[in-house]
From Swiss-Prot:
This is Small ribosomal subunit protein uS10. Part of the 30S ribosomal subunit. GO terms for biological process: translation. The keyword Ribosomal protein applies. It comes from the Bacteria. SMART domains: Ribosomal_S10. Keywords: Ribonucleoprotein, Ribosomal protein. InterPro entries: Ribosomal_uS10, Ribosomal_uS10_dom, Ribosomal_uS10_dom_sf. GO terms for cellular component: ribonucleoprotein complex; ribosome.
Length: 105
């Protein structure tokens, strides 16, 4: 029976995302657990086009975009020390973390 912990990190800023990934990887490696990653997942780009003028000049438009960067970390066969180390990691405010526990029975 092998358990896995999957950690998905999302952020608009890839610098803070990479920093958070390094902190998690170093915390897990201190507990001597095996970790796969960071695996860069495809970034999602949302583009918005709006008119510059509210009345005329339809051809004058502005374009904005939001880039969402993602990383995946997989911890194989975690022990309680890994969970304790992950709970103590302090991450940046702009990084969203989703943790999934997967049990392989």
């Amino acid at each position: 029976m092998k358990n896995k912990i999957k950690i998905r990190l999302k952020s608009f800023d890839h610098h803070s995302l990479d920093q958070a990934t390094k902190e998690i990887v170093s915390a897990v490696k201190r507990t001597f657990a095996s970790i796969n990653g960071p695996i860069p997942l495809p970034r999602k780009i949302e583009r918005f086009t709006v008119n510059r003028s509210p009345h005329v000049h339809k051809k004058s438009r502005e374009q904005f975009e939001i880039r969402k960067h993602k990383r995946l970390l997989v911890i194989d066969d975690p022990n309680p020390a890994v969970v304790d180390a992950l709970s103590k990691v302090d991450l940046a405010a702009g990084v969203d973390v989703v943790i999934e526990l997967e049990s392989g029975e």
